[in-house]
Amino acid sequence: MATYIVGDLHGCFDELQLLLKQVNYNPAQDELWLTGDLVARGAKSLECLRFVKDPKNNAKTILGNHDLHLLATLLGVKKVKPNDQVDAIFAAEDRADLQNWLRNQPLLIQHPKYGFLLTHAGISPEWNLTETIACAREAEAVLQSGHYADYIAQMYENTPDHWSAEWQGIERWRYIINVFTRMRFCYADKRLDFACKLPVEDAPNELKPWFKLDNPLFHQQDIIFGHWASLMGKADKPNIYALDTGCAWGNHLTMIRWEDKQIFTQERLK
């Protein structure tokens, strides 16, 4: 049995299949975990959703910001972005089933055997492990509730940019969602920054990657994330694994086999 974790798909279904072929993936014995953002920029977002949803493939994902945006567009509260290739999802006969399945996916997974944390964008530098898990479950409960559409319609803001246990309602939920699905850089005081999308070496001096801030969790815990393609897999910390390597942007799809930490890649198909 092997445990495989793959970075952001963004509709790159054929590349995923070639990666799995490289390792002779056997869903009867092996596990496949994904860092979210199954959909958007690649041509086969529908196929990605159906593959991960199908129990026979033994695949599990967490939610990314593009997955949440897809939910918002399916609900009619946001428009499809010009470069997103999701028309096939809107036309699919199983659209409602896919929508319901997607909103029931987690924001955070702790692997039951190995204990690593799987998140799309990151973990707040202000949270310990207990808070991290509790906040994920809290936000997931909203997405799985009957009033999730009201919250999704209000998630498109950058505030609050810091954590307070006193936050309630949409502000609290929005901070949690932004941490798990959008975060990249933070200030030294642990406030979130959403303006900078530059590579780390080109970012202003006052900004640091979230995983470089002072939080014991970032030293004690194995953390796997996607979202940040410009890192190109380099987090420069032995227990932090960045798996989004921009396949949808013309680079490659990355997968790690957890047992021996071997990396497998598949170049973007033309």
From Swiss-Prot:
InterPro entries: ApaH, Calcineurin-like_PHP_ApaH, Metallo-depent_PP-like. The keyword Transit peptide does not apply. It catalyses: P(1),P(4)-bis(5'-adenosyl) tetraphosphate + H2O = 2 ADP + 2 H(+). One of its GO terms (molecular function) is bis(5'-nucleosyl)-tetraphosphatase (symmetrical) activity. CDD domains: MPP_ApaH. The keyword Hydrolase applies. It is an enzyme of class 3 (hydrolase). It holds the Pfam family Metallophos. Its EC number is 3.6.1.41. Coiled coil: none annotated. Keywords: Hydrolase. Belongs to the Ap4A hydrolase family. Hydrolyzes diadenosine 5',5'''-P1,P4-tetraphosphate to yield ADP. This is Bis(5'-nucleosyl)-tetraphosphatase, symmetrical.
